[in-house]
From Swiss-Prot:
Pathway: Protein modification; lipoprotein biosynthesis (N-acyl transfer). The active site is at 267 (proton acceptor), 334, 386 (nucleophile). Its main location: membrane. Keywords: Acyltransferase, Cell inner membrane, Cell membrane, Membrane, Transferase, Transmembrane, Transmembrane helix. Catalyzes the phospholipid dependent N-acylation of the N-terminal cysteine of apolipoprotein, the last step in lipoprotein maturation. It comes from Photorhabdus laumondii subsp. laumondii (strain DSM 15139 / CIP 105565 / TT01). Residues 227-475 form the CN hydrolase domain. This is Apolipoprotein N-acyltransferase. InterPro entries: Apolipo_AcylTrfase, C-N_Hydrolase, C-N_Hydrolase_sf, LNT_N. GO terms for biological process: lipoprotein biosynthetic process.
Length: 509
C-alpha cells in the first residue's frame, strides 16, 4: 500500500483522530501546554478533508471521543465513589457522556463537508470557525449545556490571552480554529502566505497582553481570609458529622474575626438547612457584627414558594449592619444546576434505579438568572456557585459597573485528585480576565485562591489541606469591551463569515 492510499484509509484517519483529540486535553490545566490546542484542531481539520459528510462525521466523532474521553473522564471518580453501581456500569456512563459530547464535532464536520467540500481557505479559515462557533453554542445549551473543554481557555498562559477582555473566551476558540485551518492550508497546498497569516493571528495579540482595561482601587485594599475545610465528601452530608464540621470552620475562623473584614467559607460549608440553623446563625451573626467582620458562607435552604417547598443551593452573608433574620436578606441562590448532581431529569423514573440518581441534595430548585450583587463590608461582589463560574455569559449578565470583586464558592471534593478541579480552576481564572476583576475562590478541598484581574494567580492553597488563605486584595473598576458587549461582536462576525462563505460558495458553484 503506497503512502497516498494509506492516508486515504478511513480506519487510519479514525485512529489518528482519536490521537489528535486526546492530545487536546494537554492544552488545559493541569498540563497547560497551550500549543496542544492548535495541534488538536489542526488534526481535526486535516483528517476531515476529502471525505463524504458521513465519513467526516465519523472521523470527527472519533476526534471528539479522544478529547472528551481523556478530558472529562474525571466524572468517573464521583460516579464510582458515590453512584452505588457496578464498575462496568460506571465505565459505560463515562463512555456515554464522551460519546454524547462527540456528536457536536461530528455535526460540525458533517455540515462542513456537506457545504464546503473543497480544500481551500474558504472552508478552512472562514466556514470552519463559524460552524464551530455554532456547534459549540449548541453543546453549551442543549440539555442545560456542558461547555467544558473550550479551547479558548488554553490561552490563559498563551499568546492570545489579550483577546479575552475584548471579545471573550469563545472568540479565542474561534481564532484558534481559523489559524489551525490556515496551517492546514499551508501544509496541503504549500501556501506560505497562509502560514504567515496564521502566525500573525497567533502573535499579534501578544504585545497588548499587559494592557489594563481596569483600574485598581488601591485605597480600598481589603484583607480576606478564605477557609478551606477539607471535609471528605463521604462524610459531608452525614448528620453525625455536622457538629464536627462546624467546629472545623469556626476553629479556623475565630483567629481572624475582628482582624479580617471578610471571611469566606465554601459552597454548602454548613451542610444543613438554613431554617434548622437559625439559632447558630443568629449567634454567629451577633459575634461578627460586634467584631466588624462579615462572613460569606454556602448553605442549603428550603423555602415555601407558592404551594411547594423548594430547596436552594445558596450563599448568604452574616455580620451585616442589619441583624440576621431568617431567611438571610443578603443572599444568592444558584441558578444553573448540574444534571444528576443537583437535579434529576425524569426523577420519578430514574431515582428508583440506582443510588447515582438519588445523591444527597439532588433536588434543588433554580434561583433567578439575574440577582442582586452581594454587599459585603462595603464591597460589591458578583457571585457564582461552583459550575456557574464556567458560564461566561451568565456571570457577565450579573456583572455591574460597580462590581469590585467576583466571588465563586465550590466543592470539588466529588472529583478527588482528578484533573477536573484544575480545569474548573482554569475556567474561573478566565472570568477574572474577561471582566477585569479580582476573583475570590473559596473551596472545600481546593483549589482555594485569589485571582488578579489579569487572570493570574495571586495566592492559592494546596489541594487536600485544611488551611486558611489570607490575602490583601485590591478591588478594581472599569469596563472591559467584553463586559460591555458580551458575545454580540463574535456572533456578528460568525454570521458575517457564514453569509460570506455561503454566498461565495454558491457563486463558485
Amino acid at each position: 500500500m503506497n503512502k497516498a492510499s494509506l492516508l486515504n484509509c478511513q480506519r487510519l484517519r479514525a485512529l489518528l483522530a482519536l490521537f489528535f483529540g486526546a492530545s487536546g486535553t494537554l492544552a488545559f490545566s493541569p498540563f497547560d501546554f497551550w500549543p496542544a490546542a492548535i495541534i488538536s484542531l489542526f488534526g481535526l481539520q486535516l483528517l476531515t478533508l476529502n471525505r463524504t459528510p458521513r465519513q467526516a462525521a465519523f472521523i470527527a466523532f472519533c476526534w471528539g471521543f479522544g478529547l472528551f474521553g481523556s478530558g472529562t473522564n474525571w466524572v468517573y471518580v464521583s460516579i464510582a465513589n458515590f453512584g452505588g453501581m457496578p464498575t462496568t456500569v460506571n465505565i459505560l456512563l463515562v463512555i456515554l457522556l464522551a460519546a454524547y459530547l462527540s456528536l457536536y464535532p461530528a455535526l460540525f464536520a458533517a455540515l462542513l463537508n456537506r457545504f464546503f467540500a473543497k480544500t481551500n481557505g474558504l472552508r478552512l479559515a472562514v466556514a470552519a470557525p463559524a460552524l464551530w462557533q455554532l456547534t459549540e453554542f449548541l453543546r453549551g445549551w442543549i440539555l442545560t449545556g456542558f461547555p467544558w473543554l473550550q479551547f479558548g481557555y488554553s490561552q490563559l498562559d498563551g499568546p492570545m490571552k489579550a483577546i479575552a477582555p475584548i471579545l471573550g473566551v469563545e472568540a479565542i476558540t474561534f481564532l484558534l480554529m481559523a489559524l489551525s485551518g490556515l496551517f492546514v492550508l499551508a501544509v496541503i497546498h504549500r501556501k506560505i502566505v497562509a502560514g504567515i497569516i496564521a502566525v500573525a493571528i497567533l502573535l499579534l495579540p501578544w504585545p497588548i497582553r499587559h494592557y489594563q482595561w481596569y483600574s485598581l482601587l488601591s485605597e480600598k485594599t481589603v484583607d480576606v481570609a478564605l477557609i478551606q475545610g477539607n471535609i471528605p465528601q463521604s462524610l459531608k452530608w452525614d448528620p453525625k458529622m455536622l457538629s464536627e464540621t462546624m467546629d472545623i470552620y469556626m476553629g479556623n475562623s475565630l483567629p481572624y474575626i475582628g482582624k479580617m473584614p471578610i471571611i469566606i467559607w465554601p459552597e454548602s460549608a454548613i451542610p444543613s438547612l438554613e431554617s434548622y440553623q437559625r439559632h447558630f446563625l443568629t449567634k454567629l451573626d451577633e459575634l461578627l457584627r460586634n467584631q466588624h467582620t462579615s462572613l460569606i458562607t454556602g448553605i442549603v435552604d428550603e423555602r415555601a414558594v407558592g404551594d411547594r417547598d423548594k430547596i436552594y443551593n445558596s450563599v448568604i452573608v452574616l455580620g451585616d449592619k442589619i441583624p440576621y433574620q431568617y431567611p438571610a436578606a443578603i443572599r444568592y441562590d444558584k441558578y444553573h444546576l448540574v444534571p444528576f448532581g443537583e437535579f434529576v431529569p425524569l426523577e420519578s423514573l430514574l431515582r428508583p434505579l440506582a443510588p447515582f440518581f438519588n445523591l444527597p441534595m439532588s433536588s434543588f430548585s433554580r434561583g433567578n438568572y439575574i440577582q442582586p450583587q452581594l454587599s459585603v463590608a462595603g464591597y460589591n461582589l458578583t457571585t457564582a456557585i461552583c459550575y456557574e463560574i464556567i458560564l461566561g455569559e451568565q456571570v457577565r449578565a450579573n456583572f455591574k459597573p460597580d462590581t469590585e470583586f467576583l466571588l465563586t464558592v465550590s466543592n470539588d471534593a466529588w472529583f478527588g485528585g482528578s484533573i477536573g478541579p484544575w480545569q474548573h480552576f482554569q475556567m474561573a481564572r478566565m472570568r477574572s480576565l474577561e471582566l477585569g476583576r479580582p476573583l475570590l475562590r473559596g473551596t472545600n478541598n481546593g483549589i482555594t485562591a485569589v485571582i488578579r484581574p489579569d487572570g493570574e494567580v495571586q495566592a492559592a492553597l494546596p489541594q487536600f489541606t485544611r488551611n486558611v488563605l489570607v490575602a490583601k486584595v485590591t478591588p478594581a473598576t472599569g469596563i472591559t469591551p467584553y463586559a460591555r458587549w458580551g458575545n454580540w461582536p463574535l456572533w456578528i462576525i460568525t454570521v458575517s463569515f457564514s453569509l460570506f462563505a455561503l454566498t461565495y460558495n454558491r457563486r463558485k458553484s
